[in-house]
C-alpha cells in the first residue's frame, strides 16, 4: 500500500544525486496518520483500490523523474507526467466527495419537518381545548340526567301527586343540551389526525435518509484518508521535482512549506468526519423524539375516537328515553328505569374519555418540550443531558 511503503521508508527516503541529497523527514505525527491509513486500507476495499492506483501513478512519475535527476535535467514530458499525476489524484478524491455532496449541516428536510410538527401540535392544542369543552358539556348533561333521576325518586315517593313535573323539567333541560360533540370538534379531529398520519410518513422517509447518511460516514472516512495520502504523495513528488531543478536549500524550503498542510489535513478531515457523525446523530435524535410523540398521539386519538363514539351512542340513547318520557308523560317511570340502566355506563365512559383526553394533551405538551430540548442542544448536546422520553410520560 502507498501508506505502508511510505511509512516503511520513513527513516531514509532520498532522491537525487549523492552530491545533492534530498531527504523527506516523516515525523511521528505523519507516522500516526500513515499507520491509520494502512489500517483503513485493509478494512475498506474501495480505499485499497484507490491506494493501488495511487501507488502505481506515484511509482511511474518518480521513475520518470529519477532519470532526469541523474542528469540534473527535466524534460517537458517529465513535467507533464508530474502535472497529470497530481491532477488524476485530485480528481479521484473529488469524485468520491461528489458522490455525497449534500450539505449535512443545513438539512432543509429536517427544518421543514420540525416546523410542520410545531404547526401541527399547535392545531393539536386547539383540538385539546375543543375536546375539553365537549367533555364539559357531556359532564353537564350527565349532571342534569342524574338530577332528573334524583327528582324522579323524590316525586315518586309522593303517592298523591305523581305528575313528575320536576323530573320532566330536568329531562327537557337534558334534551336542550343535546349532543356535546360539535361539528367543530369533528372537523378539528379529522384535521389533526390526518396531519399526524402524514407526519409519521414524512418521518419515516427522513429517517431512511439519515440512516443512509450514517452509512455514508464510511465514505467520508475514506475521503479523509484519500485527502491525506494524496497530499502526502504530492510532497514526495514535488520534492523530487525540486531536487532535479534546484539547490538543496530550495528543496528544504518547498518541503517545509508543504509539511504544514500535510500535517494538518489529517486532523482537519478527521474533525470533518466527526462533526458529520455528530450532526447526523443529532438529527436522528430529533426525528426519534418527533416519531415517538407522533406515534403516541395517533394511538391516543384512536382511543379518543372510540370513546367519543361510545359517548355519542350512550347520550343518543338517553335523549331518546328523555324524549319518550316528555311526550308520553304516563310512561315517565318506564323511561327513568331505562335511563338508570344507561346512566352508569354513560358516566363511566365520560370519566374514561376524560382520562384519555388529559393524558393525550399532557403527552403533546411533553413531546413539544422534549423536542425543543433536543433542538436547543443540537448538534452539540448529548441525549444524556435530557430526561428520557419514557420518564417524561
Curated annotation (Swiss-Prot):
It is a multi-pass membrane protein. Keywords: Coiled coil, Membrane, Transmembrane, Transmembrane helix. Residues 1-20 are annotated as: Disordered. The chain crosses the membrane at residues 226-246, 249-269. Residues 149-222, 299-356 form a coiled coil. It is found in: Membrane. One of its GO terms (cellular component) is membrane. Pfam families: DUF677. The keyword Coiled coil applies. InterPro entries: DUF677. Belongs to the UPF0496 family. This is UPF0496 protein At2g18630. It comes from Arabidopsis thaliana (Mouse-ear cress). The lineage of its organism: Eukaryota, Viridiplantae, Streptophyta, Embryophyta, Tracheophyta.
